[in-house]
Amino acid sequence: MKRPIGILTFIFGAVLVFLMFYCVYPPLTYANPPQDVKLGYDSNSQTLTVTITHKSSFTGFHYVKFVEIKKNGIGVITNTYGSQPNPAIFAYNYKISAGKGDTLEVTATCSLSGDKTATLDFGK
């Protein structure tokens, strides 16, 4: 009789610890890096469009916090955001000149966990 009670106590304790962790720090259960970053460039207007896929139910708490743009390996733009405009897919536009031989690298960083980088190469 003692053995089944001990197992049930252990299982109950493990479930209780998991639920306490889940309730005390829920962001870890929702934290994920951006799933995708797509780049588009309009040479006429010299505008870089960065389309980011980052699913979040709490866009004011779990969002893409930084977007960093490097041109030929040198950081030229870093924008900091306090929320995400859409809970799944959204785009930002940046004025930046680029031409033949240039490379643009964009990194989107989650406010809680991880980042995703995309590169646009303009060839030689």
Language-model region placement:
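A short beta-turn/strand-edge loop motif at beta-sheet boundaries
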Residues: S56-H62
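Beta-strand signatures of extracellular beta-sandwich domains
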Residues: F66-K70
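Exposed aromatic-hydrophobic patches
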Residues: V50-I52, I89-S97
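Solvent-exposed serine/threonine-rich low-complexity stretches and specific carbohydrate-binding patches
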Residues: I74-P85, D121-G123
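Surface-exposed, short loops/turns at beta-strand junctions within beta-sandwich domains
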Residues: K95-D102, C110
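Short acidic/polar inter-strand loop motif in beta-rich domains
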Residues: A108-A118
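Structural beta-strand segments of beta-rich domains
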Residues: N44-L48
